[in-house]
């Protein structure tokens, strides 16, 4: 566990939770998938978050996933966990994260309730102050804090970043320009590569990458082209890979998670196209469409051409 008060930067890994056909967590597969992300150069691991089906995990499974992530990372990159939901569970899982050696956590929305700004502030503050771990706010769904509330939270040294999942660019510009480098700014929109051309210029130069779970070298090519001003390559990858995959993602609710698993299975990685309800597995026809996209992507952008 590191005490560095800084949000992770770059392409951030969000591993899925690999379940077998009976719905049991496959620990060895999770370890191998995390090692794959690290071998491909991802700058951090965010375990048991949205992509890891946080909402479906038991406390025992959560502990297992955190232990595996910390072991796989072996101190080479920071490990962040997902905490949130009802407050008592969030505090328990924050404590578990600290005990298991994580570096920080991503604070997910409270369960069900649409609170007032003061209530959301108190919810977030309580979790942040409960441990000495780094904390990242996640703006999404029923938990969207205003500039005023986030400025109040910056008084807490544990707060190191903000991840946006709503796409309110006016708010994002206000946040990043007003608060500046006091926080790290993360793009957490579904299929974040889609919006990175808009986010990077306003300081959101880090992002959670779904496709890095199965074609990380292409995500890396896109990211480096974006930062280096290679507009031709950005446009090409955008049109040939990112938009086609995103069009499939939008076909069903829950595909933001299950399409990752389908892509990993197609690419021969250690996961099956299974998910826990209410998320549904990817339908066969959509799997075939994704397979064709990936086949063409690998032919056009073979791994040896990636700048890793």
Curated annotation (Swiss-Prot):
Catalytic activity, EC: 4.2.1.41
Spans traversing the lipid bilayer: none
SUPFAM superfamilies: Aldolase
Highest taxon listed in the record's lineage: Bacteria
GO terms for MF: 4-hydroxy-tetrahydrodipicolinate synthase activity; 5-dehydro-4-deoxyglucarate dehydratase activity
Entry keywords, A to Z: Lyase
Catalytic reaction equation(s): 5-dehydro-4-deoxy-D-glucarate + H(+) = 2,5-dioxopentanoate + CO2 + H2O
GO biological process: D-glucarate catabolic process
Metabolic or biological pathway: Carbohydrate acid metabolism; D-glucarate degradation; 2,5-dioxopentanoate from D-glucarate: step 2/2
Entries under InterPro entries matching the protein: Aldolase_TIM, DapA-like, Dehydro-deoxyglucarate_dehyd
Family label: Belongs to the DapA family.
PANTHER family: 5-DEHYDRO-4-DEOXYGLUCARATE DEHYDRATASE 2-RELATED, DIHYDRODIPICOLINATE SYNTHASE
Protein name from the UniProt record: Probable 5-dehydro-4-deoxyglucarate dehydratase
């Amino acid at each position: 566990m590191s005490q560095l008060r800084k949000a992770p930067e770059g392409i951030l890994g969000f591993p899925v939770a690999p379940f077998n056909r009976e719905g049991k967590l496959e620990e060895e597969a999770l370890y191998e998938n995390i090692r794959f992300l690290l071998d491909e150069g991802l700058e951090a691991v965010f375990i048991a978050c949205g992509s890891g089906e946080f909402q479906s995990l038991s406390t025992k499974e959560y502990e297992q996933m955190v232990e595996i992530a910390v072991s796989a990372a072996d101190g080479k990159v920071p490990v962040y966990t997902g905490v949130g939901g009802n407050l008592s569970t969030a505090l328990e899982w924050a404590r578990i994260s600290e005990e298991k050696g994580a570096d920080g956590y991503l604070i997910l929305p409270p369960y069900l309730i649409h609170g007032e700004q003061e209530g959301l502030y108190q919810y977030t503050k309580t979790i942040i102050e409960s441990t000495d771990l780094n904390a990242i706010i996640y703006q999404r769904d029923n938990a969207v804090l205003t500039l005023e509330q986030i400025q109040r939270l910056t008084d807490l040294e544990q707060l190191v970043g903000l991840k946006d999942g709503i796409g309110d660019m006016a708010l994002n510009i206000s946040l990043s320009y007003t608060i500046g480098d006091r926080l790290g700014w993360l793009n957490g929109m579904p299929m974040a590569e889609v919006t990175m051309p808009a986010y990077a210029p306003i300081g959101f130069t880090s992002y959670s990458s779904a496709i890095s779970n199965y074609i990380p070298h292409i995500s890396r090519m896109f990211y480096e082209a974006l930062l280096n001003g290679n507009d031709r390559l950005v446009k090409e990858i955008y049109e040939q890979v990112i938009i086609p995959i995103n069009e499939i993602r939008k076909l069903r609710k829950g595909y933001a998670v299950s399409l990752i698993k389908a892509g990993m299975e197609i690419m021969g990685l250690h996961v099956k196209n299974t998910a826990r309800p209410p998320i549904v597995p990817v339908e066969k026809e959509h799997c075939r469409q994704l397979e064709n996209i990936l086949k063409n992507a690998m032919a056009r952008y073979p791994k040896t051409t990636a700048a890793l």
